[in-house]
């Protein structure tokens, strides 16, 4: 992802707050909506290509009276998470009059690992406020805009030409970090409270792994960050370590006291199948 694409995505998502949330939320509360909906839209875009196949498999398993469906649904979605509701962000827009109820159904359709993310964001607590302010529809509509692409797949025209590049997991991580930084500035919070700048992360990973050059053999290694924030340190450490030995396997572990940044980190890990 180049800087132009990065800035366009961040600026568009940032503009949603002023365009939709103003007069319903104070500026200090914008992050309570924008961050979880950004995460959900990313997950939604990732699952969209296999959505109908997941629904078909879910119906088939129900007809067979199979209760433990998780493994098969993960396999069908292609990821370690899935959604069994009939809705996507775009399909929610088809019934404006029932959008609150359908949004709840959509949230309930996610697998348990995504339910944890939704819970940490306390997103369900916001649904009544969104409904009372009549902004649920315009909020989802904005996140479905063709102006940005939060999917890892590129957008092409009818001739197959790429008109908008896909957003990689690393690029999505940068978007999250920039949004958090901007919200921190709005709320006069310390810049490093929720994430560490990438330049510092790269320096730290170099200091840790440079002495280990030639010592990382084939096998499985665990990387642990006891205060992982949004997961940037873990991602960069794995990226650097794999350069030292592409044949080695690395598993990432971390803990985080802030529920919001924990949710962002977990979403990133789920997408990357960590």
Regions found by a protein language model. Name each.
Residues 1-212:
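Non-catalytic, mostly N-terminal accessory regions of nucleic-acid modification and defense proteins
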Residues 194-274:
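Conserved S-adenosyl-L-methionine
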């Amino acid at each position: 992802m180049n800087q132009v694409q990065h800035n366009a995505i961040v600026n568009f998502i940032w503009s949603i707050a002023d365009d939709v949330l103003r007069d319903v939320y104070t500026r200090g509360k914008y992050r309570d909506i924008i961050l979880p909906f950004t995460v959900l839209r990313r997950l939604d875009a990732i699952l969209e290509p296999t959505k109908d196949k997941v629904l078909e498999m879910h119906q088939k398993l129900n007809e067979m009276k199979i209760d433990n469906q998780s493994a098969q649904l993960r396999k069908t979605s292609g990821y370690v998470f899935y959604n069994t509701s009939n809705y996507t962000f775009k399909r929610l827009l088809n019934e404006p009059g029932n959008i609150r109820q359908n949004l709840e159904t959509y949230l309930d359709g996610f697998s348990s690992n995504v339910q944890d993310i939704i819970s940490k964001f306390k997103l369900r607590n916001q649904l009544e406020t969104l409904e009372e302010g009549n902004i649920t529809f315009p909020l989802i509509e904005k996140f479905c805009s063709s102006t940005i692409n939060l999917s890892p797949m590129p957008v092409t025209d009818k001739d197959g030409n790429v008109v908008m590049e896909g957003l990689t997991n690393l690029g999505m991580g940068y978007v999250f970090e920039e949004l958090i930084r901007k919200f921190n500035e709005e709320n006069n919070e310390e810049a490093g409270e929720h994430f560490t700048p990438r330049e510092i992360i790269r320096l730290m990973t170099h200091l840790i792994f440079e002495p280990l050059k030639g010592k990382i053999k084939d096998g499985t290694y665990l990387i642990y960050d006891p205060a992982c924030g949004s997961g940037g340190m873990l991602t960069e450490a794995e990226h650097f370590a794999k350069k030292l030995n592409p044949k080695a396997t690395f598993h990432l572990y971390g803990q985080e006291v802030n529920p919001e940044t924990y949710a962002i980190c977990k979403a990133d890990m789920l997408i990357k199948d960590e």
